[in-house]
Amino acid sequence: YQTQKLPLFFGYTNTNDNGKIGPVFTHYLRLTSEVDSEGFPNSDHLYEFENIFKTFCYRKKITYNRILRSAINFTTHQPDDTKTYIHCDHDFPHKQFLMYLNNFDGGSTFFYDNNEKVIYKSTPMKYNVIMSDGELHSQGYCAPQQYRVALVVTYV
């Protein structure tokens, strides 16, 4: 991927336990539609990145019906926070695909049970993929002078 050709839009994650807001730059490939419906295409880069997901699913024999949302998330080091707020991407059953698109230190993805106890912590590495059943999750921030880029696809 070439970030110089991929427009990123500034936004915030929701607040975490301390009420602080974590900045994030996002390229929205597919926007969320109605509950459980395929999302709306939003980017000229949609097919390029969603084909990564589709190829992975084909090779691993993973079936899916439709893509709900897809995005490229770009975050940097945040000295006042260690991770983003704990959240679930949708309020209905779904699955999640996350692929790290670069190497960096820190910035793990954490998955939680319903009591917000960590049940899994990823080790980020370029092109590593995490598939989940839509569990609660959060992300850590990368080390100073680094950035974290991830492709996220939610689907059913």
Language model feature labels by segment:
Residues 1-65:
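Non-heme Fe(II)/2-oxoglutarate
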Residues 17-20, 78-84, 138-141:
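Short catalytic/ligand-binding loop motif for oxyanion handling, primarily in non-cytosolic enzymes
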Residues 65-74:
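Extracellular-facing segments of soluble proteins and assemblies that are Gly/Ser/Thr-biased and enriched
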Residues 72, 91-92, 103-156:
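Catalytic core of Fe(II)/2-oxoglutarate
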Residues 73-91:
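Conserved short histidine dyad/triad with adjacent acidic residue
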Residues 77-80, 102-106:
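Short, charged/polar surface micro-motifs in flexible loops or helix N-caps
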Residues 96-101:
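Catalytic nucleophile-His microenvironment captured as a short glycine-rich beta-strand/loop
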